[in-house]
């Protein structure tokens, strides 16, 4: 659809590089150029990176379908997530809370002068995104005088303009989840004191603005421009049906993702708090109490597993039971031989565990905690050992009832979440270039493959590794495969990081490390033309129908060029946009249906033809009756283009009646009477001769 030059890309040039044909730094993995893009309402929002930095030049908004820049705010370093909140009340219905959120600051206040002042203790946390003196429009003075007791706050940004709307302060720490109406929910478990067990669970809601009710109790969603003290914005705080306890283990590490809270050198034991792993709003919370790494891993670097290790689940579904009821707490024996068990991904029905050293998976029933399948067979090739062992590779994902696993082995596997069975693989058929990642370009013998996104029945794959080499691997692709059978849908030359992707509304947006551009891939608009020559004919004669089907994408490299078949699309894009291959001389166009409506209103199917590499199609047509015809050329659309059609008309005249030959007088022919008279005379003479002969004696 379009490309967006984000940073330096391609080959540097000159002769001062250590390696010939040196490329620019791609940013992997610590200075990503296109980190955390957000797509919302047909707009993609992303940070503009400074030189060798993730952010620094503001945030911009680009139309998802056209690539047009809508606004840029240099005063925002980055945005963390979006929100589409559906507020419902007797007076108000529909999605009205439409925001981008900037998080992670302390005690932000909005002055009556319209100047945002983060305060001296918060400037570094904001990375200067709202420096003192930045005028973001007039807003009222702070109305809340409650002291800030939390170390985090949120700023709401208008997605249409990039301007600050309001703040939410006193936002608690916890695990964030997106609610059923678009609320941002934060949950955590707590205890009475530092030595007590964990006995209560709460849920905070970012839409519970205090006092946001009009007189009479009929509520409306009107946040206004102010600071909102969210210290009381809780949906509920409930007592757990049974307490959750810390565990002490000899195996562990400090850090996030539920790792150990403390270490006692005297005993050699790590203290692990109960930690939420995943929230399924309105359904359940899944957690652990063993400080285990999560996959993608935390980079903790330890091996082995606490024996036993503990998992649990808490009910959030009021129709199933009390909110806060502990559904199950289970301990599991660690596998033999010092295997490291990691917390895998999953859905609301099945959780997964990953055995790192043996590259195996286990399925856990989320309703009971029972193991329902696994361990699976060891994955191959052996390079897959590095699957998700750091937080900077993300070779896995869940969707469509599958656990999708890839990695340094270059093979995508689709594990059935119900059974653990591998329903299909992709990338391991050396005899099929459309189903192989094998290459001599890497030390692994294949392209390390990561799951970048799962959406709309598709799995998007990128080929990269931690700390990508420069120049990048020759031939590495970004690919899209069918999520149910692994069929390759398209591939394009380009290497990327799984962290530099976004997909929504049928469009896939990603950063190409090869040329430093953002690419938007999806179905583009098309245009069809049709003519017939000659336009007026005599019945019995033929006309030649011609026309074109062309790409109308906003990309200047594509607009007005031929629409090409899905089968040839990948190579065509490499040629037209990336200029990385020669013109594919055998590329096919698209199918065009030719029909006509005759003078009597009858529909006539003429034929289905295929356009060529220039977009042209043609077909002879011989009308059968006289009168006016409408001829319709229809391109029904494809995986690459939207539909279009065109009409033209011809006239058919009745043939004039045949002209009779001229009539001339017929001359009298005397030949036959003369001949006849001669014959009579001859006969008479003969008779006389016969009679004379008879009279002779």
What is the role of each PLM region?
Residues 644-669:
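C-terminal low-complexity, Ser/Thr- and acidic/Pro-rich disordered "stalk" regions positioned immediately N-terminal
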Residues 684-697:
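C-terminal membrane-anchoring or membrane-association module
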Residues 602-603, 639-645:
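Short, exposed coil/turn segments at beta-strand boundaries within extracellular/luminal domains
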Residues 611, 617-625, 635:
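Residue-level recognition of secondary-structure-to-loop junctions
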Residues 540, 615, 625-629:
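Short tyrosine-centred short linear motifs in exposed loops/low-complexity segments
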Residues 665-679:
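Juxtamembrane/start-of-transmembrane alpha-helix segments at the extracytoplasmic/lumenal side
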Residues 1-538, 543-572, 577-578, 585-596, ...:
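Secretory-pathway ectodomains
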């Amino acid at each position: 659809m379009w490309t967006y030059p984000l940073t330096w890309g391609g080959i540097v040039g000159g002769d001062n590089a250590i390696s010939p044909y040196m490329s620019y730094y791609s940013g992997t993995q610590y200075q990503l150029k296109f980190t955390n893009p957000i797509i919302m309402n047909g707009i993609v929002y992303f940070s503009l990176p400074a030189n060798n930095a993730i952010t620094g030049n503001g945030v911009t908004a680009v139309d998802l379908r056209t690539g047009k820049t809508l606004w840029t705010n240099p005063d925002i370093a980055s945005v963390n997530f979006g929100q589409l909140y559906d507020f419902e009340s007797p007076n108000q219905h529909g999605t009205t809370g439409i925001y981008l959120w900037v998080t992670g600051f302390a005690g932000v206040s909005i002055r009556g002068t319209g100047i945002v002042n983060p305060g001296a203790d918060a400037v570094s946390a904001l990375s200067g995104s709202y420096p003192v003196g930045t005028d973001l429009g007039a807003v009222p003075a702070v109305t809340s005088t409650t002291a800030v007791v939390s170390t985090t706050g949120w700023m709401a940004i208008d997605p249409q303009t990039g301007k600050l709307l309001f703040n939410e302060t006193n936002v608690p720490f916890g695990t964030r989840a997106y609610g059923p109406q678009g609320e941002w929910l934060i949950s955590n478990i707590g205890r009475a004191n530092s030595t007590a067990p964990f006995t209560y669970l709460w849920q905070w809601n970012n839409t519970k603005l205090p006092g946001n009710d009009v007189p009479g109790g009929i509520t409306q969603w009107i946040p206004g421009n102010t600071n909102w003290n969210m210290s009381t914005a809780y949906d509920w705080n409930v007592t757990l049906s049974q307490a959750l306890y810390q565990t002490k283990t000899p195996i562990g590490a400090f850090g996030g993702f539920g790792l150990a809270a403390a270490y006692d050198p005297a005993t050699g034991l790590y203290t692990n708090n109960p930690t939420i792993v995943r929230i399924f709003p309105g359904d359940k919370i899944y957690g652990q109490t063993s400080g285990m790494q999560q996959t993608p891993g935390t980079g903790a670097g330890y091996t082995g597993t606490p024996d036993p290790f503990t998992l649990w689940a808490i009910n959030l579904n009021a129709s199933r039971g009390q909110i806060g009821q502990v559904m199950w707490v289970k301990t599991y024996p660690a596998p033999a031989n010092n295997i490291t068990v990691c917390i895998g991904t999953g859905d609301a029905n099945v959780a997964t565990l990953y055995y790192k050293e043996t590259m195996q998976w286990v399925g856990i029933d989320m309703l009971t905690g029972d193991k329902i399948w696994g361990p699976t067979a060891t994955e191959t090739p052996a390079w897959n050992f590095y699957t998700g062992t750091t937080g900077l590779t993300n070779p896995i994902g869940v969707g469509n009832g599958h656990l999708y696993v890839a990695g340094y082995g270059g093979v995508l596997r689709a594990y059935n979440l119900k059974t653990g069975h591998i329903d299909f693989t992709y990338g391991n058929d050396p005899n099929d270039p459309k189903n192989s990642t094998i290459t001599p370009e890497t030390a692994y013998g294949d392209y390390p493959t990561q799951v970048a996104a799962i959406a709309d029945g598709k799995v998007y794959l990128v080929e990269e590794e931690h700390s990508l080499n420069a120049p990048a691997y020759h031939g590495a692709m970004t690919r899209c495969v069918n999520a149910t059978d692994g069929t390759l849908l398209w591939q394009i030359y380009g290497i990327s990081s799984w962290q530099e992707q976004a997909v929504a509304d049928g469009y896939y947006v990603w950063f190409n490390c090869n040329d430093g551009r953002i690419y938007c891939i999806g179905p583009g608009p098309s245009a069809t033309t049709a003519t017939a020559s000659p336009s007026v004919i005599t019945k019995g004669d033929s006309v030649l129908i011609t026309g074109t089907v062309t790409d109308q994408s906003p990309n200047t490299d594509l607009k007005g060029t031929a629409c090409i078949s899905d089968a040839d699309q990948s190579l065509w894009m490499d040629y037209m946009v990336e200029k990385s291959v020669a013109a594919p001389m055998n590329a096919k166009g698209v199918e065009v249906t030719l029909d006509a409506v005759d003078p009597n209103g009858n529909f006539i199917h003429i034929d289905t033809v295929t356009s060529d590499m220039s977009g042209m199609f043609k077909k002879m047509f011989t009308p059968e009756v006289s009168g006016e015809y409408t001829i319709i050329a229809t391109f029904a659309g494809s995986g690459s283009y939207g539909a279009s059609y065109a009409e033209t008309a011809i006239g058919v005249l009745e043939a004039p009646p045949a002209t009779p030959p001229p009539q001339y007088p017929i001359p009298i022919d005397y030949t036959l009477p003369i001949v006849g008279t001669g014959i009579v005379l001859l006969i008479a003479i003969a008779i006389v001769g016969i009679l004379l002969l008879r009279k002779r004696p």
